[in-house]
Structure formats: C-alpha cells, structure tokens
Amino acid sequence: MLSRLFRMHGLFVASHPWEVIVGTVTLTICMMSMNMFTGNNKICGWNYECPKFEEDVLSSDIIILTITRCIAILYIYFQFQNLRQLGSKYILGIAGLFTIFSSFVFSTVVIHFLDKELTGLNEALPFFLLLIDLSRASTLAKFALSSNSQDEVRENIARGMAILGPTFTLDALVECLVIGVGTMSGVRQLEIMCCFGCMSVLANYFVFMTFFPACVSLVLELSRESREGRPIWLLSHFARVLEEEENKPNPVTQRVKMIMSLGLVLVHAHSRWIADPSPQNSTADTSKVSLGLDENVSKRIEPSVSLWQFYLSKMISMDIEQVITLSLALLLAVKYIFFEQTETESTLSLKNPITSPVVTQKKVPDDCCRREPMLVRNNQKCDSVEEETGINRERKVEVIKPLVAETDTPNRATFVVGNSSLLDTSSVLVTQEPEIELPREPRPNEECLQILGNAEKGAKFLSDAEIIQLVIAKHIPAYKLETLMETHERGVSIRRQLLSKKLSEPSSLQYLPYRDYNYSLVMGACCENVIGYMPIPVGVAGPLCLDGKEFQVPMATTEGCLVASTNRGCRAIGLGGGASSRVLADGMTRGPVVRLPRACDSAEVKAWLETSEGFAVIKEAFDSTSRFARLRKLHTSIAGRNLYIRFQSRSGDAMGMNMISKGTEKALSKLHEYFPEMQILAVSGNYCTDKKPAAINWIEGRGKSAVCEAVIPAKVVREVLKTTTEAMIEVNINKNLVGSAMAGSIGGYNAHAANIVTAIYIACGQDAAQNVGSSNCITLMEASGPTNEDLYISCTMPSIEIGTVGGGTNLLPQQACLQMLGVQGACKDNPGENARQLARIVCGTVMAGELSLMAALAAGHLVKSHMIHNRSKINLQDLQGACTKKTA
C-alpha cells in the first residue's frame, strides 16, 4: 500500500518537474517573507543588547569547531565523489548541490518561521552537513539514468520512489526521534543543535521527496538532445541501476526501526508531558532565561543601521576559523570541477559519441574479432586467456587493466559502428582507471552482493566467475546482466559463458561476434538476452533511377546472385530513362475483435460505427493518442456475435503498429462507454492482418500502397537482359499470372518480390517478418513502342509495411543504410514523406529484380548463373565439426 502511494507521488513529481520546483521555491520564499518582519522584534546586536551571548569562547572550542567544519566539508566532498560514479559530475553534482542548498535554506526558513533561536546556527552548521546523505539521491538518480527515454525516466523515478520512499520515511522518523532526545537535555547549546538537526532531517526529507526527483527529471529532459537526438543517459556507464530486490530494505531492520521508533515516542511522551514537574509558567520563564530572551537581561538600544545592512555585515565579517573553512571549501570545489579526472569529463562532453571509439576491457577475447595481442599501459603483458568454451579451469588472479587503442592495426578484423571517417586512429586513448586485482577463487555470495550494491565499487570489482555464481544462485536475473554490469558488452560476454556450459558443443559461439557493438541502442528496444550480433553481408544495387533521382540501394542477404541480378535490373531501367513511382495510399491498420451478447447487437454497433456521428466519436478518441495518428477509415465485419473492426490510420514516418494499437485501445474504451455490454476479446483479432497472408491486405491495402513503372527499350532488352520482349511477356503471363492463380496464391503474382523486400528490410532496420504482407506484388508486362518491341513493366504493391523511425532503425548500421537512401529519421517538413519515399524505393527495386529474374528465366540462364555464383567452393570436410566429416 505504501509503495503504491510513493510510486504515485514519484510519478507525479517526475511528470511535473517545473511545477514542483517552482512550488518548492515559492513556498520557501513565502515562509521566509511571512516571518522576516512580523516575528520577534528582538534582534540581538541590532536593537537589543544580549549580555548572555557575550560569553568568552575558549580557544580549544574554536579549534574543535574548525576541525568539525572541515570534516563536514570533506564529508560533502566525498559524497560528491560518489555521485561521480554515475558518470557526469556536472549533471548530478548540480542536482546534489541544489539538494544541499535547498535543504539549508529550508531549514533556516523553518527555524525562523517557528521563531527559534538562530545563535547556535554557526555551531550547528557542521552538524547539519554531516546529516546530509546523498546515497539515496545517488540511488534514485541511478533509476533515472537507466532509462532509454523521457517516459521511462518518469517510470523509473516512480519505481525508485516506491522502493526508497518507505525506507527514507522511516529513517527520517527515527533520526528525528533520536536527535530529539537532545532537546530534553537542559543544556542550551545541545538543545539548539538538536533542534536544528531535527529541522535539517525534515528539510532533507522534504527536498528528497519533492525537489530532487523533479530536478533530476528536468535535467535529463533538458539534456535529451545533447547527443544528436539520443538521450545522454544511454551511455553504458550511466546504466548501472541495481536489482530492485537488492534495493528493497531488510524487513528485520525495518521492524527493529519501528520498535525503536515506538520506544522513542514513549520516551518523548513521558519526558515532556508526564515526568515534567515544573509549572507551565515556570517552564516558560526558564526557557526564556536559558535562551537569553528575558526582559530583565536584554536591554533595548537604538539601531544604528538598517536591518538588511546589519544582516549583510554579519555575513561579510568572518573570523579566522571561518576563513579556513571557506578556503578549504573553495579549494575542494576548484579541484573537483577543474582538475579531477578530466578524462572522464572529456568522454562525457557534448560531442558525437560515435567519433570516440569506446575502449573497454575485454573479459574473454574472441578469435573472430581480435587476433592480435592487446597492448597494455606501462608495457604490461596481457595474460593469455582461454577461449570461451564454458569449461571451468583453474583461474589465475584477474587484473582489470586499461587498454591503449592500437595505432598500427595490420591484418586486424574489427567491427566499427558509425562514421569511420571521423575516427582519428593516430590518437591514443588511455583510461585512467586504477588496476583492480581480483581473487583467484570466487568469494562468497554475501560478500559479492555487498560489493555489487556498493556505489563506489559495483560489478567491475567482481570477476566473471563471481557474477556467474550470483546468476546461478538467482541473485542476479540473467536478463539484467547488461544493466548491472559496468558495460553492456561485459554483460553479453557473461551470458555467453553461461550459455556455453549448457550447449552440447561448448565452442558453438566462438564465431558469433559480440564485441565493439553499441548495445545501449539495443537494450529495451530491439532484443533481449543478447549473446552477440549477426554480421550479414550487405551489398548495393544501383544506381536505381527513380523519379528523376538516383539511389544506391543497400541489400542485406546471404543469397548469391540476388544483388547482382537486381543491379542488372537497375542498369536496364537506367538505360531506359528511369522509372516512375507513386504512393497510392498510406494507412497502417489494426483489427481488434469484440463480442456482444447477440449477433443483432453486433449489427447495431456495426451500423453505428458506419454513421458519421459514430465515426466522429471514435476518431476523436483515436486521434487524441498521438500527434501523427489520424483515423481515416473503419472497416467492419461480423461473424456471429463477434465484431471485427479494422482501424486504418496514417502514422507519420513510423511503421505505426504501436501507434495504431494505442489509438485502437483508446477508441475501444470510448466505444465501450456507448455499448457497455460489449466485451473486448483482443486488440488484435487477425483482421489487420499482420505478418500473415491475407486477402484483405491485398484488396484494401496496409501501410503504403505503391506502384512503379518503366519502359525498357528493345535494344536494352537484347543487349543487357539477353532476351526478347516477346519471351519475357510470355513467361510473365504463364508464370506470374497463370501459375500463381493455379497455386491459389494471394498477392503472389510476381517472380521474387520477397527476396528484394526482405534484403532491404534487414539492411534498413525494418521488421523482417513483415515481408509476408509487404511482398504482395503483381508484376505486369506489355509490349510498347512504335513497333511493339519495347517492354513496358509495372509492379503494384498494395501493402508495404515500412518506417524510418523506431525499432531497428535506431541502430547505427541500419541508420547508415537509411542515410544512403536519404530517408533516415523523420521528415520535419512533411511528416511521413521519408517512409513514403522508402516505400517507392522498395517498389522500384522490386521491379528491377523482377526484370532481371524474368529475363534470366526467359533466356534459360537462371540455373547456369546459380551454379556459377550461388554455390560455395569451400570443402566442407575440411571444416571442424562438419557433418560430412563425422560420417565419413
């Protein structure tokens, strides 16, 4: 129950950061102004002489107070160093500084508002600083920084508040009760310090629950564009959030704290209300005397300066101990900001992260990516490590050492993500991480858990064997390895080691690469339980002359002859003057199924949806879910009591499935308000239809509907395609039209459209499974020209499901392929134009592939070309583990 309340509170604070910050500041100013000139008018040193306060201070007291202040400043300094573990000393340092400053101001305002004595503030300031604990702020920031988007930032802050809120509340209560015992001591200085301490704890609690999460949410929101549109917190060293179960408090400790709180409440009640024998008036008089406020002791004087000048002079005038304290604070601040770990600051500067190759420690080197010895700082030799076979052998002492980027890399197999032309290979990147010696044998799980939960240490202080040990013991979920490790790559490496032990052939993963890949773009977006990446050859076909422009089309495939054949088709189209294309329709669909009590009720709902009034109501609800989604059409069908509704809407440059699904849910909720007896069976009732052959996609269309045409001169048909127009038309009729009809095909009136569609989809980060519907195509050929010797060809594709934002298009290699075509990302001037342009390119490339394959079939070259170009010449018996070798 409490966790749910704190979660709701955290979500509200993170979702409205400006309102919370402005409200907190306004409340502070209001409390200060309400009491500044309307409270107690007796101000010692300005309009009253207070002899009680003119006491001689021993030199030993001054020394002790100065030492205490310096310790408090050093404590705060080390707290800020802990915040550096999150990666950015500026973002979190400012947030921590705001927390400290706001807590101090709020404490001062509260005490002033309650008319308390402030003469003990000088002595109590170190006590206040020592009460500040930024560990919880650091933990909450970790939750926020493990996010991939601003929406996830809010959710993670809410989740962090749900976990940390109850614990922090109980701790604040216990601290107040413990410190509050000092207010009953009868010693004036101790009472003032303890009173101030209680106020500080409450102020820290207030700021942590309101100001700090709002500030973190706002800072991350403002910095979301600092890395070319990608959130700055996507860096690997920002994603070190701990497992939720590890953050949850120990129930035994919580029960002890609650029992302690109850006991302290009884102590306070007995001391203040039951055991106090003094009359009320006597108590009041005594308190006045003890605080130096007695009328007979204080003497009124005429102020010589105004009140603000009096306060300003008090702030400016400093003793020698205050000078020492201020000097130490300034020295540490300058050291922290300008001279400490400049390398860390440079790696987090607002430059393109792609231009700086990430140098990380390779835990278990793979032969497939790095075959040369690795260089180590100080000319230290790397220990030879065994291959990733999953077989446990006696481990030597592991040493995590910083690497140097090699400048001489002959015969080096690497995988570079991003714009390699921007890389400066002559620069030497050296991390300043100290060497960490790890034990020979894995330590106990309890010790490993403590190290993992330590903000100053973390997973990098644990060996791979210890991490594997924690995973096997269920202390770390295997699916969260990337999140918990200091780098995503190490998490993938450990998962591979875990998997290798379970495989019949432990060396199976040897040639599946995993290094030098930006997994931060994969996590939470593209794939789970990652064990590497699949390098697929990418060829280029072109130039494709389409609508007066030339395109070099990337195609990822392992089928020989496909790119070459498509390239020949592009050449033929170019020699014929190019192709023309149009987008006929644009609308992604989602087809939910609902059920009503009777078939007649379903008919009534269907009739209502087909009215202009019903459509307007549903459209308003649907369109409210997105600034791009605009409902264009409803197609309904009935099967008994079931009603199938096909929502069709534009989705901008996104493929649009998630966007349309969100709008569909909202529209169904609105429909349920009008027909309460309606039951929603599924948001997808296969009436869309997605990733399945369906006549409705072929007839009604889905995604982008495109058509492309070209005229190929007879000379080009003879010299480039090596056939005749009559032969190609004859094959097209009997193969693509009659043959497909005999097979009962739906949308398969083509030679091999799926080949080209899938190759482009894989290269450009599309959903490869959607080639089922996207490959719907009819290829038509006719004789044209004055002598009917030229070839007219057209391809019509009614359901190209494609997008240029979201999903796999966020990965850098896929973005590179989209940039080749000039359609990467969203079109700012005309939303959706990039996706439509990509659909036209797909249709034009399909036509090029159709042209070349049909020519090969007409000329009888298909089998011959595949025998030459599509058969491996490697002797499989020479390969280790080949089936032919084993059976021989």
Swiss-Prot record:
Any Gene Ontology biological process: isoprenoid biosynthetic process
Topological region Cytoplasmic: 1-9, 79-89, 150-159, 221-248, 340-888
Role noted for this protein: Catalyzes the conversion of (3S)-hydroxy-3-methylglutaryl-CoA (HMG-CoA) to mevalonic acid, the rate-limiting step in the synthesis of cholesterol and other isoprenoids, thus plays a critical role in cellular cholesterol homeostasis.
Membrane protein topology class: Multi-pass membrane protein
Reaction(s) this enzyme catalyzes, per UniProt: (R)-mevalonate + 2 NADP(+) + CoA = (3S)-3-hydroxy-3-methylglutaryl-CoA + 2 NADPH + 2 H(+)
MF-aspect GO terms: hydroxymethylglutaryl-CoA reductase (NADPH) activity; NADP binding
Localization of this protein: Endoplasmic reticulum membrane; Peroxisome membrane
Coiled coil location: none
Listed transmembrane segments: 10-39, 57-78, 90-114, 124-149, 160-187, 192-220, 249-275, 315-339
Cross-link (Glycyl lysine isopeptide (Lys-Gly) (interchain with G-Cter in ubiquitin)): K89, K248
Top-tier EC class: oxidoreductase
Keyword presence, Phosphoprotein: yes
Glycosylation sites: N281, N296
Modified residues (Phosphoserine): S872
Subunit text: Homotetramer. Homodimer. Interacts (via its SSD) with INSIG1; the interaction, accelerated by sterols, leads to the recruitment of HMGCR to AMFR/gp78 for its ubiquitination by the sterol-mediated ERAD pathway. Interacts with UBIAD1.
Regulation of catalytic or functional activity: Regulated by a negative feedback mechanism through sterols and non-sterol metabolites derived from mevalonate. Phosphorylation at Ser-872 down-regulates the catalytic activity.
Organism: Pongo abelii
Lineage: Eukaryota, Metazoa, Chordata, Craniata, Vertebrata
Lumenal compartment residues: 40-56, 115-123, 188-191, 276-314
GO cellular component: endoplasmic reticulum; endoplasmic reticulum membrane; peroxisomal membrane
Free-text description of this protein's post-translational modifications in UniProt: Undergoes sterol-mediated ubiquitination and ER-associated degradation (ERAD). Accumulation of sterols in the endoplasmic reticulum (ER) membrane, triggers binding of the reductase to the ER membrane protein INSIG1 or INSIG2. The INSIG1 binding leads to the recruitment of the ubiquitin ligase, AMFR/gp78, RNF139 or RNF145, initiating ubiquitination of the reductase. The ubiquitinated reductase is then extracted from the ER membrane and delivered to cytosolic 26S proteosomes by a mechanism probably mediated by the ATPase Valosin-containing protein VCP/p97.
Intervals of motif INSIG-binding motif: 75-78
PROSITE patterns: HMG_COA_REDUCTASE_1, HMG_COA_REDUCTASE_2, HMG_COA_REDUCTASE_3, HMG_COA_REDUCTASE_4, SSD
Name this protein carries in UniProt: 3-hydroxy-3-methylglutaryl-coenzyme A reductase
Active site: E559 (charge relay system), K691 (charge relay system), D767 (charge relay system), H866 (proton donor)
Family per record: Belongs to the HMG-CoA reductase family.
EC number, as in UniProt: 1.1.1.34
